[in-house]
């Protein structure tokens, strides 16, 4: 779980580095009202940035579950539970680190307090930090944080379904065909005449 927490820091830092900011303009209308508008398709970054975080967390979930599957002697439900807890923690850390880094990089933006230029056209171009979550509702935040655990559980279940042995290949390996051979050797044979 500590390893997954450390990767959460890396994922949060990577997301903060590649997440696109939102560019906007703040202006005063002729009626004296302060307005703001996003430039071009910049408003799409409100969706793109959180989706990029989900993509990075999904990659982490697939890689982590595949690596954990290699740890043969501990395969089973306890590993899935630990993987789920670790990935949920990693997602929370990634979201926290990402939000902190973009906040430090772009600062907090309040459209009502942006200083405007003087002159005929009172306007200012601003850059807004990308959001970490799609919305600020608790359910959407919880689903975002639990997303990698669900992906990892799905990958782990597919790997378990593809295993031919009931013990998921754990150690010590028990080969049913070798048991049949030893039983056949121990069974007394009737003399052949």
From Swiss-Prot:
UniProt keyword terms in alphabetical order: Cell membrane, Membrane, Transmembrane, Transmembrane helix
One Pfam family hit: DUF2567
GO cellular component, one term: extracellular region
Membrane topology: Multi-pass membrane protein
Membrane-spanning ranges: 8-28, 46-66, 82-102, 141-161
Protein family according to the UniProt entry: To M.leprae ML1222.
Keyword Zinc: no
Name the record gives this protein: Uncharacterized protein Rv1591
Source species of the chain: Mycobacterium tuberculosis (strain ATCC 25618 / H37Rv)
Organism lineage string: Bacteria, Bacillati, Actinomycetota, Actinomycetes, Mycobacteriales
InterPro entries named in the record: DUF2567 (IPR021213)
Localization per Swiss-Prot or TrEMBL: Cell membrane
